[in-house]
Amino acid sequence: MIAISYLLLTLFLAGLSLWLWPRRVGRHAGARGALNASLVALLLAALSSLLLTFGQWGASSAAMADAQRIFGLAAQHISLPLLGLATVYLARGLRWKPMIWGQVILGLMACFELSRYLGWQPGYHWLVNLIGAAGLLASAVLYLSRDKRIAGLCLIAPVSLIAPTLFSQQLPLTALLSAEAGASWLLPGFVAAALAVGLLAEQAHNSDNACPSNDSTTAPR
C-alpha cells in the first residue's frame, strides 16, 4: 500500500505539472515566475516520491538513496513554502521582477544550510513549512467571498500537509524523505495546492494585459 501511495503521488504531481505549464501563457512576467516556482515545488516532490517508489519495489542503490535524500530534503524545505508564497502572490496580484523567485529559492536553500550548521534544522523546518501553510490559509481568506473553489483548495492543502504531523509529533513532510504510511496525506494536499495555483493564475489581474497601478502590487478588491 505504501508503494501504491507513492506511485499515485508521483503520477498526480507529474500530471499537475503538465497541467500548470500551459497556464503560463498569457500571464504577466511575475505570474509566470510564480507558476515556475510552483512547478519547481511540485517536481521536487515528484522526484522524491518517484525514488521512494523505486525503493519500495526493491530497485535501490547507494546512488539512488543519496539522490532521494537530496530531493527529499529539498522538497521538505522548499515545496510548501513556494506553493504558499505563490498562492498569496497570485491571489493579491503582486508584481515582482521574475528574478526574485530564483532569489527566494536560493535563499531557502542557503537558510537550510545555515540551520544545519547552527543546529537549528528542526526549528527551521517547522518555520518554513508553517509560513507556506499560512500563505495558503491567507489566500483562502482572501478568496472566501470571491471564489469558494479556490478558498476550499487553499484550506485543504495545509490541513492535509501539516495537520497529520501535529498528531504524530513528526516534522512536516517527513514522508518525502523516507517511506511512511503517512504519504497518503500528501496526495490531497499537493493536489489542492497545485489546483489553487492554477486557478489563481487564471484570475484577470494576473493576465498579461492587466495594467498594474504601480510597480509592486495590484491587489484585488
Question: Which role fits each region the language model picked out?
Answer:
Residues G72-L144:
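Membrane-proximal helix-loop-helix units in multi-pass membrane proteins
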Residues L44-L51, I105-R116, I156-Q170:
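Aromatic-anchored segments of alpha-helical transmembrane domains
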Residues M1-I70:
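N-terminal topogenic module of multi-pass integral membrane proteins
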